[in-house]
Structure formats: structure tokens, C-alpha cells
Amino acid sequence: MNQDLALRVMSDIMQWDDDESRKEFRWLKLMARLKYDGYRDFQAGMRFTESLATWLQQFDQEERKDAYRFVKERMVYVGPGEVRRLVEQFFPNTIRQRIVQTVASNLGIKPYTVLTNPDAAAAIKRLSRQTLVLGLSDGARMDIVRHANVGRLSNEQLVLAPQIDTEKWKDLLKNLREDLEDPDALFKIIYLVDDFAGTGTSFLRYKEKDKKWSGKLNRFRTSLFNAISDPEVGNIVAPDWQLCAHHYMATANAKDKMIASENTARKDMKH
């Protein structure tokens, strides 16, 4: 369906008069061109006006104005360019800040002094290599993370796999120790990365029927401890290691849900 036809269909569905049609057509064309038609994920190539018209037809006539107003005034859409910017800022604004804060705390100095302190600079370089980033889905955009951080993070530190097998853990540990020239080196920071958390349940949830924990965090935990229990692998993470979950976007409800689930899971899981 071309845009002119889609707009006429929208006008019929919403029962707009000529003045309303002219006003709303300007907004629909603008938003389609600047934002919505750039969508490339689950159904790339879908057109905004056509999709909106189809969606609105599920409502009774008296409900359509409210549904349309919701899309126009309340819906938040993050386009490809904005997502890319969020991904590119992940290392400098999140990982780097945690590394600096950790080193400063360990050395008992102020974070703003680390770059002038030779010991701190060396510790930052080492801790940066002891950081591992695991993408939980394609939405983690690990390719963009890799390209945006050449010289900061090596390919061996970026893994797209929600559940790593024992052989992969062995390879990651081997590469870490070779790079640091330290046969006893262990990972100290691990990031679990995904694009969006809407409810928080896919990350961690308790299955009442099965009486067990499930979700991406639990799969990571199982993967890690399976590898640690292998005599050929042993310890992978340092005693004071940090596990961080990072979503490029999340609802407030998902954040609260994940925190609550984590607190409950800590009481249930003994490791």
C-alpha cells in the first residue's frame, strides 16, 4: 500500500474531516519519514501509516480516538540511530566508569586522580582485560560494541551467547591468561547485555509450576558453575568478581521486577 492510499484509509478509519485530515497527515508523514519507517528489527520494511491503520481497526469507533492519541502522545519509539548511540555509549559511560571506580576504591584514591597515578593506570589496563561482555541476544548489538571499542575491548572479551559451554569458558580463560601473561589470571567483571527489558521476567523468573528459577540470568549461572566444576577449568572468576546486568532500555516496572527477583533468588540459590 502506498502512502497516499494509506493516509486515505486512515482518514476513513478515524472519520476525520478535511481540516483534521490535513493536520494529522502532516504529523503522520513527518513521523513516518523521520522515525517509524526506519524500523529494522522483527518486521523490517513495514510502513508506519499502513501498520497504524491496520492496528486501529481492532477498536470500536469510539475507542479509536483514544488509541490514536495514545500512539501520538504517549508511545516512545527509539529509532536505529538512537539505539546505535546507546550502544556506542555503553563502554565509556558504563563499563569504563565501573572500572575506574573499582580501581580507585581498591587503591583508596579519588576516581578523578586515577589517570595521574601510574599504579592506577596499570590497574585499569589490567582490569579492563579482566572484563567480559556477554550478549544475551542479537539485540545486544555486539557487532556495534566491537566496532565502537577497537583498542578498548578485544574480540575475546565480547561473546554473543546467553549460555556458554565449558569449552568456550576454557578458551576465554586461556586467552585472558595469555594476554596478561599471568597463568593465574581470572575474570573480575562480567556484563550480561541485552537491548530491552519490558517486564523483567525473561531475565529472571521463578516458575511456580516447576518450583525452580528460570531466565537468562539463571542459564548464565548454570553455564558458569558447570565450567567451574570441571577439573580442567576450575576457577574462572576472582573471589571479588562483579556481575552486572545492562539493558540499553528498560521500563521502570522491569527494573523493579528484576531487583526483587534477584533479592529473592539470592536467598534460594546457594553459591
Description of each model-found segment:
Residues 1-271:
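PRPP-associated nucleotide enzymes
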